[in-house]
Amino acid sequence: MRILFDKNVPYPLLRYLAKHDVRTAEELGWARLVNGDLLRAAEEAGFGVMVTADQSLEYQQNLKGRKLALVVLSTNRIGVLEKHPDRLVAAVDAAQEGGYEFVRYELPPKRKPGCLG
């Protein structure tokens, strides 16, 4: 399957999807494309899934009738994402044409300024 990583997705995650043809928006010169334009370009280029950390896309874009699926990550913090790469893999595998898959990650609690612990 052809998968596109949006510019806000850390590229080290590529290794967890090695069985797929994964490209990044930056690699393709699409870093300045946003929302609908990026989805349209991805679809026209034959991508089946786009992975993004832009949680607002669900409300901005209607995928009904599109051939592209969207996998939305709840964070783009690589330290958090790499603790559970299986969640990304499962979401990509479950992605259906014209649909959304949401991948939730728990963030560590924020430390108060000046606290060492």
Language-model regions: role of each:
Residues 69-112:
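C-terminal structural segments of small proteins and small subunits
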Residues 30, 58, 76-80:
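Glycine-/small-residue-rich active-site loops that bind phosphorylated ligands and cofactors
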Residues 115:
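Small, basic N-terminal interaction modules of short regulatory proteins
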Residues 40-41, 67-71:
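Short, hinge-like loop/turn segments at secondary-structure boundaries
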